[in-house]
Amino acid sequence: MTADNAIFIPPYKADDQDVVVELNNRFGAEAFVAQETRTGMPVLWVKRAQLKEVLSFLRGVAKPYSMLYDLHGVDERLRTQRRGLPAADFSVFYHLLSVERNSDVMIKVSLSEGDLNLPTVTGIWPNANWYEREVWDMFGIDFAGHPHLSRIMMPPTWEGHPLRKDYPARATEFDPYSLTLAKQQLEEESARFNPEAWGMKRQGANEDYMFLNLGPNHPSAHGAFRIVLQLDGEEIVDCVPDIGYHHRGAEKMAERQSWHSFIPYTDRIDYLGGVMNNLPYVLAVEKLAGIKVPQKVDVIRIMLAEFFRITSHLLFLGTYIQDVGAMTPVFFTFTDRQRAYTVIEAITGFRLHPAWYRIGGVAHDLPRGWDKLVKDFVEWLPKRLDEYTKAALQNSILKGRTIGVAAYNTKEALEWGTTGAGLRSTGCDFDLRKARPYSGYENFEFEVPLAHNGDAYDRCMVRVEEMRQSIRIIDQCLRNMPEGPYKADHPLTTPPPKERTLQHIETLITHFLQVSWGPVMPANESFQMIEATKGINSYYLTSDGGTMSYRTRIRTPSYPHLQQIPSVIKGSMVADLIAYLGSIDFVMADVDR
């Protein structure tokens, strides 16, 4: 599939300084403090008084930064390695992305503990809404002018701000929990929906509106997810997505785990993505450490990541078709996934959560006979995809339920932070594997599937075509697997190569310390985004020169995709919402972290 209106994506330049020149010309160089990082983008600190003006300029500049990719905070109070940075108790960063420039810029602002206030930027980027709510929820930073600044991850009755450094990280540091009858009633009452709090009316000119809870326990909600619908008959007048039921504090956990021992936790973010979750994390850590992995490691990582893209998309395909009323395909897609997991298990030893990538390499070399398993799979799957297309995706009922439903264009997708198949279904040719190649993707031949309607049907068809392209990539990995080691020869590779521990006592001691306490990473910041199964996933790491991360920010694609729902579905029927939810392809662990 192609689109006639695809945006031209220029070649990617890391640390592109063009925007810095534009900012200096507009505001003067003295308005900014540049920070040297390993994030691959300019990082500039600005004063709070100029923050909104700077962000508005970047939103309106030629080839604008149309996407607020991420917005979050850092508790700076215990950070020791801050040379050259503005004094700050807390900081908030705004990560902006321009598809037309194919470049990013990060704007930071410092705050003192006694004055945690910033202006809202929801008028510049609508998707700032949830991000600002989360920053308030996690850090207690207020955003003046926000339309509804309230808890989003934690329950409404929660006390404290969990990502502050003085907030306990372990359950044993809290008082024992007991659920009294009074507390239970308070929690139940706090979950009651109040339409007026969200600017909704209970009555129209000639009718009373009905308010319907879809979820948090509903099969079409795809997890613990609640949407409160304001209905006029079956027409959706407005809606409020309610998330946080699956929140596990993944970013807080990262502050108490070593760089190495956090790898299994990444598997549980998008729990259908497997090693795809490991990839941005280990790449970001390797940037901190200055590790360049052998070519064989890159090819192995790409091959396994594409296997998990296929397993995730197969699950999407089956449940999506089931959501619109066809039962049989989901049983076939689950059976087909098992064939992929047989290959994955033979290589990694595990199925859903291998936690198999390592800092500087992978856990072990490819086993004997891996090539035959992979060859059989890549020869078998294309015929199955042909059958799905013919039997289900060309079905007139499915087309009638999904074509033209929940459609949006490229401009709207970028404003809401939509990435992955949701963005490419609008005709925007932005796939990081092509636009910003990582791990050697530039060495592979594959196409980026596009559509042009941006509706529920196109989002499905793009993912089906992506599976075909993943097969092409896996086949090239099979035919061109390099020889060589499966770990980098670097002091911070974890676990280190074990062979030399049998020869030198100093190497044995270093190996013991690195495995037990974890490697010590240089003080710096790094960032890595990848084209994951559900869109762009990234890790933004801050090291203070220790064995654990000072701050780990996990930006997931499903989070902004759910925030976009009200802007797309208003005026549609409840049945259209079900088709829309299925077409998004999300899991709540990816949303709530």
From Swiss-Prot:
Looking at the record, which segments are called NADH dehydrogenase I subunit D? 208-593
Q: Which reaction does it catalyse?
A: a quinone + NADH + 5 H(+)(in) = a quinol + NAD(+) + 4 H(+)(out)
- List the residue ranges of the region (NADH dehydrogenase I subunit C): 1-184
Any one annotated GO CC term:
NADH dehydrogenase complex
Keywords (alphabetical) are: Cell inner membrane, Cell membrane, Membrane, Multifunctional enzyme, NAD, Quinone, Translocase, Transport, Ubiquinone
- Gene3D superfamilies per the UniProt record, alphabetical: Cytochrome-c3 Hydrogenase, chain B, NADH:ubiquinone oxidoreductase, 30kDa subunit
Top EC category: translocase
Is Cell cycle there in the keyword field?
A: no
The cellular location(s) given in this protein's UniProt record come to: Cell inner membrane
> What membrane topology is annotated for this entry?
Peripheral membrane protein
Q: What GO MF terms are annotated?
A: NAD binding; NADH dehydrogenase (ubiquinone) activity; NADH:ubiquinone reductase (non-electrogenic) activity; quinone binding
Give the matching PROSITE patterns: COMPLEX1_49K (PS00535)
Q: Which InterPro entries match?
A: NADH_DH_suC, NADH_DH_suCD, NADH_Q_OxRdtase_suD, NADH_quin_OxRdtase_su_C/D-like, NADH_UbQ_OxRdtase_30kDa_su, NADH_UbQ_OxRdtase_49kDa_CS, NDH1_su_D/H, NiFe-Hase_large
Primary residence: membrane
The keyword Methyltransferase belongs to this UniProt entry's keyword annotation = no
Domain of life where this protein originates: Bacteria
What are the EC numbers? 7.1.1.-
**Recorded family membership:** In the N-terminal section; belongs to the complex I 30 kDa subunit family. In the C-terminal section; belongs to the complex I 49 kDa subunit family.
**What HAMAP family would the database entry show?**
NDH1_NuoC (MF_01357), NDH1_NuoCD_1 (MF_01359), NDH1_NuoD (MF_01358)
**Protein purpose:** NDH-1 shuttles electrons from NADH, via FMN and iron-sulfur (Fe-S) centers, to quinones in the respiratory chain. The immediate electron acceptor for the enzyme in this species is believed to be ubiquinone. Couples the redox reaction to proton translocation (for every two electrons transferred, four hydrogen ions are translocated across the cytoplasmic membrane), and thus conserves the redox energy in a proton gradient.
How does the record describe its quaternary structure?
NDH-1 is composed of 13 different subunits. Subunits NuoB, CD, E, F, and G constitute the peripheral sector of the complex.
Q: What is this protein called?
A: NADH-quinone oxidoreductase subunit C/D
Q: Which organism is it from?
A: Pseudomonas putida (strain GB-1)
